[in-house]
From Swiss-Prot:
Protein family: Belongs to the lipase chaperone family.
Membrane topology category: Single-pass membrane protein
Pfam families: Lipase_chap (PF03280)
Cysteines joined through disulfide linkages: none
Cell compartment(s), UniProt: Cell inner membrane
Function: May be involved in the folding of the extracellular lipase during its passage through the periplasm.
Alphabetical UniProt keywords: Cell inner membrane, Cell membrane, Chaperone, Lipid degradation, Lipid metabolism, Membrane, Transmembrane, Transmembrane helix
Keyword Lipid metabolism: yes
Organism placement in taxonomy: Bacteria, Pseudomonadati, Pseudomonadota, Betaproteobacteria, Burkholderiales
UniProt cross-references to NCBIfam families, sorted A to Z: PRK01294.1-1
Transmembrane regions listed in the UniProt entry: 14-34
Entry protein name: Lipase chaperone
Amino acid sequence: MAAREGRAPLARRAAIYGVVGLAAIAGVAMWSGAGPHRGTGAAGDAPDAAAVGGVAAAAPQAAVPASAGLPPSLAGSSAPRLPLDAGGHLAKSRAVRDFFDYCLTARSDLSAAALDALVVREIAAQLDGTVAQVEALDVWHRYRAYLDALATLRDAGAVDKSDLGALQLALDQRASIAYRTLGDWSQPFFGAEQWRQRYDLARLKITQDRSLTDAQKAERLAALQQQMPADERAAQQRVDRQRAAIDQIAQLQKSGATPDAMRAQLTQTLGPEAAARVAQMQQDDASWQSRYADYAAQRAQIESAGLSPQDRDAQIAALRQRVFTKPGEAVRAASLDRGAGSAH
């Protein structure tokens, strides 16, 4: 079972880690509230994960060493850097949300008060004694108010993804809550995401309109695409290319292609650099599977040793730190442990 716990198909991991640029979310994603975070990287998933298609952002780069007091879900990781403007104030950037989303990865491990304390410590580690520290704390309180407001929605804001009217209402509700709680921070936090969701919803409305002929649909979709900013069009083209690459990787795996054959095929369609990244990912994946299987066996021994929950959790956390030394690996292992229904 241990090996299966750590395994993820290479095509899916290609999407997660961005083999060929931006990762694509195919189709319509689940509309969810602010639930616990689970992810393969240090940043995890954003709490406002609702999206009608779109592009998944890459995990932010770690900026400062992790403190010794991190909860198990963040063990072995470091917080993303909080950006500052030229005047030393907190920059109005999506990176600020990424910082808070990193901290929210520990939500399942901590009480609300302990989570607040964690955020206060992580902010102080970067901004202690600065005006930006006060600003970051204020934005955190606003963000918490946003998440709390989402949680009050019916079914925490979850809707039937086939009901376009409900999707439209959910978008409007979230935008209203974001503006009410975050104020001028709502745009850097959610502006690009909301625009993308509305664009994708408009596409769905066109494609599902039975009163239109195929030619009319194509005409309206083309007109809609022309409304897309140039940078968004370029991003969409990259998404389309990556989606095709992911499909190709899945087909090659399904056909039992050897690593050399897969690399040769991908070199023809993606180029040598992307093919080399896939090959490296295959090697990294094999290494991960082996180390996770060994770790899971040792973890099972600890779990069966009759220790108190506190001692058991401490020993497993220490084991993760010894086995998984690269950034984000211990977080990934802890996430897989929770998903497997083990100690965490």
